[in-house]
Amino acid sequence: MSSSPSLNTWSDALSGFSIGWFPLGLVIVAAIPLVFIALYALTYGVYGERKISAFMQDRLGPMEVGFWGLLQTLADILKLLQKEDIVPTVADKFLFVIGPGILFVGSFLAFAVLPFGPAFIGADLNVGLFYAVGIVAIEVVGILAAGWGSNNKWALYGAVRSVAQIVSYEIPASIALLCAAMLAGTLSMQQIILMQAGPNGFLHWFLFTNPIAWLPFLIYFISSLAETNRAPFDIPEAESELVAGYFTEYSGMKFAVIFLAEYGSMFMVSAIISIAFLGGWTSPLPNIGGLELNTMTSGPVWGAFWIIMKGFFFIFVQMWLRWTLPRLRVDQLMYLCWKVLTPFSLVSFVLTAIWVINH
């Protein structure tokens, strides 16, 4: 596939302007639209989980606030804003306060390299995939700060479990993504997508051009569930054992920020798997004879639509699994990581290398 020039749209557009002596202003201005889009999407991700959970339990879910309960999440935010911000007297106040902030920053910084379309990306880094994986790992620091700073044994147990889980599953997840990078020959997210673009839609995606790609695809998806503490890997938040895990002592907006960070991570890993194996913002529809479906459903607006829909699809699957699979034990969690996913990820890496050499 042919490559395209750099698409650092926002940074290029802002490069001709200067905000006084404060260069950071350029970054802030560029980040504002992305932050609002992310917050809007994640706010309704909470609403979506409530509705999906209700459907699977034969309930209606939120219905009273707005049409079909669409304003329920906004009402909850207003409620949390009015809640008392409680800091335990025995807590390490600095760590207790900064923990949710680190979680939030770690979750949303990765959006800077996420391509929402052919010309809608914060920064097209040539190591974008590596950056996204690494920056999400910052959440480990926030989790540990929240658990330790709470000075609560249940919070600390939950934090230690979460850190062990995230660090362990980063290994098979990273190796699985390296398979996609090897197929594309680059770590740039935009270039990985462009390598999967073409008039035949989904037939150009790595998942359908390389049978080996199914193995790293499944490995990364399973690992992403563990990295985001989603069921059946929600051991750090096991209510029957740890009350609420590392955020047991949090209330008000600090509690809300932790949940926003969780949903931000859910969308981020869903977007990464879409980019690495399912063509990112490219249309799945092929051109059939004179019916140019792919051409008609491509472009900046369609690109944003497709990657958001692919991301929401994987978020739906994560929510679906929450109500389908029982929670694993700690020993089962570690066994799956070190004795199943990690060896298979190495096998997939070798097979992908052989495929690339021979094709």
Curated annotation (Swiss-Prot):
Keyword Membrane attached: yes
Membrane topology, record value: Multi-pass membrane protein
Highest rank taxon of the organism: Bacteria
Catalytic activity from the UniProt record: a quinone + NADH + 5 H(+)(in) = a quinol + NAD(+) + 4 H(+)(out)
UniProt GO MF annotations: NADH dehydrogenase activity; oxidoreductase activity, acting on NAD(P)H, quinone or similar compound as acceptor; quinone binding
Compartments, record wording: Cell inner membrane
HAMAP family: NDH1_NuoH
Family statement: Belongs to the complex I subunit 1 family.
Full protein name: NADH-quinone oxidoreductase subunit H
Gene from which this protein is expressed: nuoH
